Amino acid sequence: MAKLLLYFLLLTSLSDVFGGTDMSKKTFVFPKETDNSYVSLKAQLKKPLSAFTVCLHIYTELFMTRGYSIFSYATEKEANEILIFWSKDRGYILGVGGIEMPFKAPEIPSAPVHICTSWESVSGIIELWVDGKAQVRKSLQKGYFVGTEAMIILGQDQDSFGGSFDANQSFVGDIGDVNMWDFVLSPKEIDMVYSGGTFSPNVLSWRSLTYETHGEVFIKPQLWP
């Protein structure tokens, strides 16, 4: 019994696991550059994705300093199945199935930023919305399907399934309002989400989030309306 208790305490000291938590008006805070602080999210996926939409808020001072990972979705087959990344020189980088597409940033923000990205296999069309404003549509990985059995991580870029983190690509700041759908939201629906709605996310829901924190990650009240 003593050995079992010790094993349990060791596991809980390494990470904190929470299931189905309502994260409304809260945010994950990554206070410093590391290669071991991140949040892993558990998604509800039963079949490969032929489309998706991911929306979230970020707040950071790193825009003019260096690149960093915003959202990293990896499978054992492909480390960058879905990637949302910021590059100081190229702007937002969206990736599907290991192929990346840059989107020029409309401006360098000094306040919290709301980001939505969507993609569909049938056309390959990939979209980026920044603070409710659509950027020029582009095409990427037409006919591709995003794999299941995924590791979804906030705060670090996965160069292998669930690992190979680089502190120079880590996120420093706040991430919140993370929602994901297995279909492409319409412009009207994107606007609803930007205005504070959720529109029933069915892959990841910020109002019922199953997550695990690792390293120095804190949960605090959000700093945006």
UniProtKB/Swiss-Prot annotation:
Gene Ontology, cellular component aspect: extracellular space
GO molecular function annotation: calcium ion binding; complement component C1q complex binding; identical protein binding; low-density lipoprotein particle binding; low-density lipoprotein particle receptor binding
Report residues binding Ca(2+) 2. D159, Q169
Native source species? Cavia porcellus (Guinea pig)
* Protein keywords: Acute phase, Calcium, Disulfide bond, Metal-binding, Secreted, Signal
Q: How is this protein named in the record?
A: C-reactive protein
The record's PROSITE patterns line, in alphabetical order, gives: PTX_1 (PS00289), PTX_2 (PS51828)
Among Pfam families, the record links this protein to: Pentaxin
Gene name in the database record: CRP
